[in-house]
Amino acid sequence: MPKLELLPAVDVRDGQAVRLVHGESGSETSYGSPLEAALAWQSAGAEWLHLVDLDAAFGTGDNRALIAEVAGAMDIKVELSGGIRDDASLAAALATGCRRVNLGTAALETPEWVAKVIAEHGDKIAVGLDVRGTTLRGRGWTRDGGDLYETLARLDSEGCARYVVTDIAKDGTLEGPNLGLLRDVCAATDRPVVASGGVSSLDDLRAISLLVPEGVEGAIVGKALYAKAFTLEEALKAVAA
């Protein structure tokens, strides 16, 4: 059976690596240089990096040059997210050499564009489904974006390759992942799912690992690593067991 992929996260705001609580602007804790953080995860054995431009996600500017520098310095696979919602931002993201990009808000506000991008770029495109209950939330999690399962059915029919599922109520809280939500999404699609939000312990990662046969492919880990709840080495060992 394939093992759960771990994607340590580097979220960038105003040029700094930060973590938010519930994805809310103003709740951030700063952790210094994004490049240093990314290189630390790489040297600890990560196979993926989840790199997010929070300013672009919130529409408060961007960190495009810095994001490109970090992505370019990596020998591992990079998943890029944040504010990718038109041809220009998508081209800039793909130009970094990242393995894939996550579309968020754009998928909710411009469905025709997303269908075109999925058709053109295939598995380089993942769609972020940011959920509160069964309602999707767009643009930096401040707007409603429709029903999760209706959107999932539409994206499936358009050939979307994978989904990154975040329970906003859990994100940045260290309260544990929403395993029920992950199960429900996996039951509704045959595409792989990457879990995001709430991972607080090695037991949480082991619990997500048990969902690999149901369709969970990976887990994004952020605050727990920065808060030193466990090391990345310990996490990689836990999901390999």
From Swiss-Prot:
Matches recorded under Gene3D superfamilies: Aldolase class I
UniProtKB keywords: Amino-acid biosynthesis, Aromatic amino acid biosynthesis, Cytoplasm, Histidine biosynthesis, Isomerase, Tryptophan biosynthesis
GO biological process: L-histidine biosynthetic process; L-tryptophan biosynthetic process
Compartments (UniProt record): Cytoplasm
Keyword Membrane included in the entry's annotation: no
E.C. number(s) listed in UniProt: 5.3.1.16, 5.3.1.24
Enzymatic reactions: 1-(5-phospho-beta-D-ribosyl)-5-[(5-phospho-beta-D-ribosylamino)methylideneamino]imidazole-4-carboxamide = 5-[(5-phospho-1-deoxy-D-ribulos-1-ylimino)methylamino]-1-(5-phospho-beta-D-ribosyl)imidazole-4-carboxamide; N-(5-phospho-beta-D-ribosyl)anthranilate = 1-(2-carboxyphenylamino)-1-deoxy-D-ribulose 5-phosphate
InterPro entries for the chain: Aldolase_TIM, His_biosynth, HisA/PriA_Actinobacteria, Isoase_HisA-like, Isoase_HisA-like_bact, RibuloseP-bd_barrel
GO cellular component entries: cytoplasm
Active-site residue list: D11 (proton acceptor), D130 (proton donor)
GO molecular function list: 1-(5-phosphoribosyl)-5-[(5-phosphoribosylamino)methylideneamino]imidazole-4-carboxamide isomerase activity; phosphoribosylanthranilate isomerase activity
Pathway the protein acts in: Amino-acid biosynthesis; L-histidine biosynthesis; L-histidine from 5-phospho-alpha-D-ribose 1-diphosphate: step 4/9; Amino-acid biosynthesis; L-tryptophan biosynthesis; L-tryptophan from chorismate: step 3/5
Cited function: Involved in both the histidine and tryptophan biosynthetic pathways.
Family, per entry: Belongs to the HisA/HisF family.
Name of this protein: Phosphoribosyl isomerase A
Species, as recorded: Streptomyces griseus subsp. griseus (strain JCM 4626 / CBS 651.72 / NBRC 13350 / KCC S-0626 / ISP 5235)
